[in-house]
Amino acid sequence: MQTAFDVIVIGGGHAGCEAAAAAARLGARTALLTHRFSTVGAMSCNPAIGGLGKGHLVREVDALDGLMGQVADAGGIQFRMLNRRKGPAVRGPRAQADRKLYAAAMQAAIRAIANLTVIEAEADDLLTADGRITGIRLADGREFSTGAVVVTTGTFLRGLIHLGEQSWPAGRIDEAPALGLSAAFERIGFALGRLKTGTPARLDGKTIYWEAVEMQPGDDPPEPFSVLTARISNPQILCGITRTTPATHDLIRANVHRSPMYSGQIQSSGPRYCPSIEDKIVRFGDRDGHQIFLEPEGLDDATVYPNGISTSLPEEVQRGILATIPGLERCNMLRPGYAIEYDHVDPRELQPTLQAKRMRGLFLAGQINGTTGYEEAAAQGLVAGLNAARCAGGGEGVVFDRADGYLGVMIDDLVTRGITEPYRMFTSRAEYRLTLRADNADQRLTDQGIAHGLVGAERAAFHRRKMAALAAAKTWARSLAVTPNEAAKHGLALNRDGVRRSAFELLAYPEVGWDDVRRIWPELGAVEPAIAVHLEIDAKYDVYLQRQTADVEAFRRDEGLVLTDIDYSLVPGLSNEARGKLEKARPRTVGQAGRLDGITPAALGILAAYLRREARRRPATA
């Protein structure tokens, strides 16, 4: 067997698959290390991809030729565009997935990638020399040499499952944890923290009384994640919605002392925006009920995931809780819910490329960086895999910034501010939401992906055709114009000012849609429907995008002021507090420094002035 690789990825979850695929797409000889190939692409918690903010990340991964979007399309059994009634900037594509179909599609995608070798084994140690990674050692003693390692261990680092008063070591249910790697990180000098997440019970859908719950259909037709997916071919299913009751809340209150989170058994922080049902009752006890989404796990699988009642209460209490919920009174619980604690690294130990500051060639992605969610993991994995391949090949790292995409927002948040609880992506975290929409991820990122060698020939050709068609349609729409009187003949009431307005300008009006301009110019029917959607959104946001472009340019100016190897003790005028924070964080740019807690606008002005003085001094002393 081959024992030398350019890149080795440890872990075959959502981050690991994207990391391995990205590195291999760049031509790096890549190994994906996983305990069992049959678990590659496993959905450890909820059987769904996307959502608010998260759906943006999936589209961005797809724009960079990642796997998740196409795999979700292959496994999706209910697609919904969340926030459809709101503006395009905050809409979030989401898909309910068939667990088996999703995993099978991911495994098939991994098998089909050139330059990628899958090794079924456990990593036990990281091999280093002179401040850089040189290889890994497996639990069976074998060693592999490499130019870069991407660690994507999810919840496996010293994972510990909690169920009521019981606890036992595990990476997820029925799978062993990874112990050796935690020791390796500590030996290198990382201070590891602990985080917690949880999952609800699994139910037998054949024993749910579906007549007692509200049924929720998906969108018709379903909208795919990937631009390369022509249509969704899987049968589409309904999900159910029920609620907890006062009896549910009383039972939880009576037993909350038996929850590991409240007994003191678990000390670590869980995800604020995905709380356990115990947390919901303690924190929001005045509510009459909490929604529960009953999500089927597959087309030929009766298992149902009750989204909204994650818990680690004892098994018998969980059964009692189900008996108080409409539709679930007599359902069979196939597996109890549980909580899991695991090690993580402070993401401020990382550069924006996701390479560790203290160890060249070591990259981290996913839950090890303090995030929660498949989509957050996948986006980090892609960036880490890209940069690991470039590092192994002697190239410079690639940084996606906050104006590039939600993946840039997430990584900047992590490496600049760190985390105190599992990090989840929301649209509210982004400053440039009008620009960073789910519908334009390919317009923002695919050209960058092509430039970095991430994007294959099929997607590159498709992208060029699409961009050419969009540009042509926009030019055409700007060339067609009507007077207010002419528009009135077609039912459009405009200000009678005699000014001719183009089709593109008409589309900017909130009450004017594509069908309205087609009534005036039937020839616009030749524009592809997908292109017409983009054209209308661009027109609606045009004025606002011009303003946001100015904001982005100002942001990029600050990001262009690089703080490389600065001795902050030599910068006059900085407070001791600012010096200490800058020395500890070592921000890459003035822009990143401004996002540190406690760094004032005055301190940023001092830094910018210092950089200008140093720039003037260099030519004089050269």
From Swiss-Prot:
Disulfide pattern: none
Oligomeric state and interaction partners are given as:
Homodimer. Heterotetramer of two MnmE and two MnmG subunits.
Q: Where in the cell is it found?
A: Cytoplasm
| GO biological process entries | tRNA methylation; tRNA wobble uridine modification
Q: Which residues bind FAD?
A: G11, G12, G13, H14, A15, G16
Cofactor(s) the protein needs = FAD
Q: What is this protein called?
A: tRNA uridine 5-carboxymethylaminomethyl modification enzyme MnmG
Q: Which GO terms describe its molecular function?
A: flavin adenine dinucleotide binding
Give the UniProt family note. Answer: Belongs to the MnmG family.
Binding residues for NAD(+) = 270-284
Q: What is the protein's species of origin? A: Rhodopseudomonas palustris (strain BisA53)
Q: Which UniProt keywords apply?
A: Cytoplasm, FAD, Flavoprotein, NAD, tRNA processing
Purpose: NAD-binding protein involved in the addition of a carboxymethylaminomethyl (cmnm) group at the wobble position (U34) of certain tRNAs, forming tRNA-cmnm(5)s(2)U34.
Q: Which Gene3D superfamilies match?
A: FAD/NAD(P)-binding domain, GidA associated domain, C-terminal subdomain, tRNA uridine 5-carboxymethylaminomethyl modification enzyme MnmG/GidA
Q: Which GO terms describe its cellular component?
A: cytosol
